[in-house]
Amino acid sequence: MPRLSKLIEKLEDRLSGKWGRWYARHKAKLPVYIPLGLGAWYLYGMFVNSLRLGKQSVFNTTGEVIESIWVFNPFKNLIAPFTPFGLGVTAVIALLICLITKKGYSWLSGYKFVRDKRGFDILPDGTHGTSGFMDKKERARILETGPVDQLAGTVLGKYKDDPEDDDKYAEYVTLKKGSGLTEHTMVYGATGAGKSRGFVKPFILQCAKRARLGLQGAKDSLGQVCQPESLILVDPKGEFYESMSGFLRDEGFEVRLFNLLDMENSDAWNCLADATEDPNLVQSIAEVIINNTSNSEERQDFWSKAELNLLVALIHYVIRLKGPDGKLLPIHERSLGAIYRLLSSESFQSLEEIMNSLPKDHPAKAPYGIFKLANRQIWGNIAIGLGNRLAVFQNPLVDKITAYNEIDMTLPGRKPCAYFCAISDQDSSLEFLSSLFFSQLFSRLMNYARREGDGGRLPVTVNVCLEEFCNIGKLIDFKKTLSVCRSRGIHCQLIVQSISQLSDRYEKKEWEELIGNCDIQICLGCNDQMTAEYISDKCGSVTIRVNNNQFPLMPLFSPVYGTTRP
């Protein structure tokens, strides 16, 4: 049972908070409110005294002469409302108000409706829907509110009892641990809506706080030991790395930058290095490249499929290249750039001789054999098409940052890391590289969790914040990844400009599955009709009171004749 001092302290905090908010809202008008309040008090006391003296003059049994029922003495008028007669008058007036007004009727009858600030009454019947904002009990069950330094979850917004309250009385809102909701988040925000400032930067700070608590072995609100966390972030302008990387290093994060915007300042990542360790990745690497360099009509045509088989064969060949000593070549000689150089420098006859010289059990033989089922006369055309898809490797910087391997894809699941992927918001020719980066990230982390994790979960929780989600290229089968990665200890935050943009990138209702996997959806603002209608429909319907007034319209000066047909 709580101690009396605690209850008193809690009551004082509540009263001081309410009084403080009221004072902040009305501070400028207090010089007007105070005289008006005193005047109203004085006039009401005069009214009570007039009723009392009027009653005495009508039912006078003492013979006392009452000259006037009006009293102007301010002391008598200010005291009158608190006399037994004054309290009785006040009670009668309050009862009449309850009987006359709708609010009073709801108090007496128990039929409680809510008066909306937009000017209509929300009824409890639920005939046409029961949607509405959370009340305090519902918020306490799902959300945590309070000062941001006392919260560790992802900041979802601010809450104020009254929109007119000062910001210092606002409480930050985060998802409560153990609420039953997934931490996958979908954020909608048009250009300039504040996605970076309002969501991403607070998300980074809260992630760093949780990682620090995890390293310290602190306990969360459920009494469980906090788990260390990592952060993988899309950085469309390079601003997050510039402003937050030093802070994250000081917090103990291993920081890496895969920079497709300013490649001379990038850490290197070779996707074929991961394929060397896990050959099952070869097919997915080839599919990501083909799908992200094709339009929707080309992805299933003959040429794309033929180029896919040729690319799979070349990847299998390159990742197994050996030197004269019989050992695998250094990783920087086994890259996508090496495949492009093989296509551009070797004649197709030389490529044919290389493939024919491979052992029969070599993994490159099967996809190359399927490629050769095409008419021999178009083999060169297929090779030219694949070379065009890989043309970005003509750039020495692109070749360099994809040759060496300085970014470990499984490290974020083993220790706190902060990986930034800087992408261009103008040039789409490198989208397949950012898509490859995140496709392999999810694949490698989930495989590591399945094989090495405790109960199939990563030792370190990984947060993947996909800012400008639609501009990183299409992630193959991401709807399946999103539906299962939570159980592996991976949480995703998808940030898009609009639903129309999302549906353009992920077609055939796939975008609906992505949204359906996100229990938390935040709308920072939208300009398109599709997003506005979706959010409105998602909010649901509510039952309101509708008043219909009907009366006949009759002319003032002309008689109305009623006629009937025989």
What are these regions (language model features)?
Residues R3, K168-Y169, K176-I490, R505-Y506, ...:
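P-loop NTPase motor domains
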Residues F302-L308, A313-H316, C417, K480-S483, ...:
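P-loop NTPase motor core of the ASCE superfamily
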